[in-house]
């Protein structure tokens, strides 16, 4: 039996779930882009919530097969765009509900709340090949996603990050292009 972690994210562009082992091996990386009509700049939050509500069953139904014979140690989920008190988007409510339901069905696995931005930062840390170095001290990160194109100071804090915006633009286009490309 392998110990695993499950992650769920419902951003304004993609319904996502992932499974990784305690050693960091990715067993599943499931993504379903939300439909954005041609010529549109994005989705209204109500449309994103509706799309996630439609997508989540398809994504979540694939997890039991991936997890068969394994043990879920914890479930992490994105609850907001950034790790800030005033950061809120309704699209994350669908993922919160899915994560809470999944954790309850997985024997009451502990839940860990993160921001979407922290998910991007942690993905960059682990794909660097040297996460133990980056998780010891603050580092600068160039973050391009959805509504942001920023240079950030990321300081490891508990299981997430304390994030300070050093510089950035108000331009949505670069972040939208990255999110739509997946």
PLM features: residue spans?
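Short acidic/glycine-rich loops and adjacent helix/strand connectors
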Residues: 1-182
């Amino acid at each position: 039996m392998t110990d695993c972690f499950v992650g769920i994210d419902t951003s304004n562009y993609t319904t996502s779930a992932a499974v990784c082992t305690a050693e960091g091996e990715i067993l599943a990386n499931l993504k379903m882009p939300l439909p954005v009509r041609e010529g549109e700049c994005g989705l209204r939050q109500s449309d994103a919530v509706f799309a996630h509500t439609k997508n989540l069953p398809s994504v979540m139904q694939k997890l039991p097969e991936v997890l068969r014979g394994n043990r879920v140690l914890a479930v992490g989920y994105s609850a907001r765009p950034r790790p800030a008190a005033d950061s809120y988007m309704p699209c994350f409510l669908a993922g919160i509900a899915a994560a809470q339901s999944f954790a309850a069905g997985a024997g009451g696995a502990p839940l860990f709340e993160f921001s979407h931005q922290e998910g991007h930062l942690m993905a960059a840390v682990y794909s660097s090949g040297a996460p133990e170095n980056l998780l010891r001290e603050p580092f600068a990160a160039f973050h391009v996603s959805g509504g942001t194109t920023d240079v950030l100071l990321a300081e490891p804090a508990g299981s997430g990050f304390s994030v300070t915006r050093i510089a950035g633009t108000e331009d949505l286009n670069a972040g939208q292009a990255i999110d739509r490309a997946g």
